[in-house]
């Protein structure tokens, strides 16, 4: 058990953050319609691009070549409908990440600009994790995971976000990412995240340590079995 007596300031903040995060993990509101789709396919969804863009593309800089996938993920988060989100595709050495833009941190949550950063170049075995190399449904799932972070940030103050940043430097990160997966399931993207997690494990099935490290390390991301267990316990996925 961790002793508060010997905790560093960063450790204290991380502990407080984890406790707060457990209490504030967000799921789709009861009065909000949640859509669950077992599998999105490009051939079925491409005809809906214009209507999706009109409804969910407002204030969004969509990622080139992944516009449809991003819009499908955004359609599960009505809170983000008018929020400014920039999807950036660049060589950043991590498959995907999400955070508020530093220049907008002092604004109210809904008036901030949020970034979803997608890596464009990975080397060796990690190349399989590039978004372009993943199945369509899995692409929707991992983008949805990053947008689950964005929804969470809508309820975080400047100081809360600073604590979140410190969390990434400690074991608190494990709870942070797992809460993000749980939140995503509540918004109806469980199957998409399941397909993403399954893809990663198929690609690296010969090396379980590689799976852990490539997905963030230390069991930070839920396995397909864990995701399925939560879905099976939810009435949203009863059908």
Model-predicted regions and their roles:
Residues 190-239:
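Long, well-structured alpha-helical subdomains associated
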Residues 97-136, 153:
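Active-site scaffold of zinc-dependent metalloenzymes
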Residues 26-107:
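A metal-dependent hydrolase signature that marks the N-terminal structural subdomain at the beginning
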Residues 12-22:
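Bacterial N-terminal signal peptides
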Residues 135-151:
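Short alpha-helix carrying the canonical HExxH Zn2+-binding catalytic motif
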Residues 152-181:
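Post-HEXXH active-site segment of zinc metalloproteases
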Residues 146-162, 186-191:
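Catalytic Zn2+-binding segment of zinc metalloproteases
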Residues 2-13:
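Bacterial N-terminal signal peptides that target proteins for export
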């Amino acid at each position: 058990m961790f002793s508060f007596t010997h905790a560093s300031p960063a450790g204290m903040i991380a502990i407080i953050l984890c406790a707060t995060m457990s209490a504030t993990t967000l799921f789709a509101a009861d009065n909000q319609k949640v859509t669950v789709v077992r599998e999105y396919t490009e051939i079925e969804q491409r005809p809906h691009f214009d209507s999706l863009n009109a409804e969910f593309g407002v204030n969004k800089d969509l990622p080139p070549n992944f516009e449809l996938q991003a819009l499908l993920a955004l359609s599960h988060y009505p809170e983000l409908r008018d929020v400014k989100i920039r999807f950036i595709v660049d060589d950043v050495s991590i498959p995907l990440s999400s955070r508020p833009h530093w220049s907008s941190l002092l604004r109210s949550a809904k008036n901030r600009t949020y970034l979803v950063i997608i890596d464009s170049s990975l080397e060796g075995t990690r190349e399989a994790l590039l978004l372009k190399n993943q199945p369509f449904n899995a692409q929707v799932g991992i983008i949805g995971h990053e947008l689950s972070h964005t929804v969470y940030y809508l309820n975080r103050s400047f100081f809360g976000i600073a604590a979140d940043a410190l969390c990434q430097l400690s074991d608190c990160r494990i709870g942070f990412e797992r809460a993000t997966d749980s939140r995503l399931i509540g918004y109806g993207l469980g199957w998409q995240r399941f397909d993403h997690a399954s893809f990663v494990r198929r690609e690296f099935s010969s090396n379980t340590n590689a799976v852990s490290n490539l997905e963030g390390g230390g069991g930070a991301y839920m396995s397909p079995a864990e995701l399925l267990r939560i879905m099976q316990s939810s009435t949203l996925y009863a059908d």
